[in-house]
């Protein structure tokens, strides 16, 4: 199955019409920060989009690098950080490539609304990349759509969205089997998350890099 050109979407669709773009950070990410489960540290935002979540963390003392495959949205993210007066570094990189652009290792990494864009045959490669850029003992948060979610016709593992992307909807057991060779799973559960217009069932996994 072929991936959609995400950069083309960012070039042609206004940000306020892109369903995964949200200025407000997700409640679950805010909870991790406010509870102290994740403290200011070197952090990487995987599939950072317009950089809104990275900026939120940077404003709270985190040293954040955001990575995305779209040059268009990385430029937007850089401009957004400048407007907010925070220091964030944003890098164009293929998260399914060798990630040679990322020269550092991190204490905390996360992807939100990103893993479901990656098809199963590429997920081990992605997880190995995440593993390699995180320090031993680093925390990793990932949230992706659940197969229990009724949106986009509510049928099948692969579903096409109105914006044209094709997403893969996972089960908890799939996520467990994907993560467990590389990470010690601390929490794995199905939660409800809100996007601009609807709510989704999503799989939340918080883990620690071995």
Residue ranges and their predicted role:
Residues 113-117:
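Short catalytic micro-motifs in class I SAM-dependent methyltransferases
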């Amino acid at each position: 199955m072929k991936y959609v050109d995400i950069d083309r979407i960012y070039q042609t669709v206004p940000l306020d019409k892109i369903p995964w773009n949200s200025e407000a950070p997700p409640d679950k990410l805010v909870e991790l920060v406010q509870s102290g489960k994740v403290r200011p540290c070197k952090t990487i935002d995987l599939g950072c989009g317009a950089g809104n979540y990275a900026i939120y963390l940077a404003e709270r003392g985190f040293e954040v690098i955001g990575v995305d495959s779209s040059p268009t949205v990385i430029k937007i993210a850089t401009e957004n950080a400048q407007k907010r007066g925070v220091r964030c570094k944003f890098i164009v990189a293929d998260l399914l490539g060798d990630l040679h652009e990322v020269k550092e290792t991190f204490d905390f990494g996360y992807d939100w609304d990103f893993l479901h864009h990656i098809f199963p045959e590429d997920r081990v490669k992605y997880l190995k990349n995440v593993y390699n850029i995180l320090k031993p003992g680093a925390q990793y948060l990932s949230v992706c759509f659940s197969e229990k979610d009724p949106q986009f016709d509510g049928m099948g593992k692969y579903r096409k969205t109105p914006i044209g992307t094709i997403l893969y909807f996972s089960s908890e057991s799939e996520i467990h089997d994907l993560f467990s060779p590389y990470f010690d799973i601390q929490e794995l559960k199905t939660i409800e998350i809100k996007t601009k217009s609807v709510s989704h069932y999503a799989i939340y996994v918080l883990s620690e890099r071995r």
